[in-house]
């Protein structure tokens, strides 16, 4: 797995830090260049950075820094897909760093079986980024704190990060030098953007006839967004119900 070099901190890098979603970045942006770019998004919104990693370098270089792409690590994923997504995360981050971008590795994990590879490619003492959003209770999703804290504590043990950027409210049990980034202040709601997506960007995620609104789908696509259970740790499909 490629190694993302340690982030070289500059004065003010983490002062009043806000993030901007990759899908809201553009070359003409003059108002949000002091933010770091995050990929805590549905995977289809940034799949292109894996397919064409050079295309967005000029744009990304204008921002304060870039978090490595957070390709999803759902518990329901096959292990080979989890490993593949860790590889893609680190490869993009390492490649961008080699091109002069300031990159902070995003860390995600599945269950304990992923711990042997999901922290690879990150040097000890690095600055890292995590998000509690998908592990927190909201909308139809249940709390997944137990899953999150198991991986978080293992990350502390293996990486010993210098700083941890936490997108969304940290859990009280989280230890370490945490830099809390407010989810709402960083969201598109405060940036006068409209939600949009291109249907052609979803081709890789098409799964056929899916009708449930209780998992991360846009009919008829299964789309990743982070980690934990794709079913929000609560609702699960009825195995007796015909597809």
Where are these regions (language model features)?
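Arg/Lys-rich, low-complexity, intrinsically disordered basic segments
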Residues: 207-243
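Non-catalytic, usually N-terminal nucleic-acid engagement modules in DNA/RNA processing proteins
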Residues: 1-57, 77, 158, 193, ...
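Short, flexible beta-strand-to-coil junctions
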Residues: 41-45, 169-170, 210-211, 226
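Eukaryote-skewed repeat-based solenoidal scaffolds used as protein-protein interaction platforms
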Residues: 28, 37, 47-197
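Generic low-complexity segments that are intrinsically disordered, proline-rich and/or Lys/Arg-biased
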Residues: 3-6, 12, 199, 221, ...
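Generic alpha-helical secondary structure signal
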Residues: 11, 18, 99, 156, ...
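C-terminal accessory extensions appended to soluble enzyme cores
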Residues: 1-9, 176-207, 214
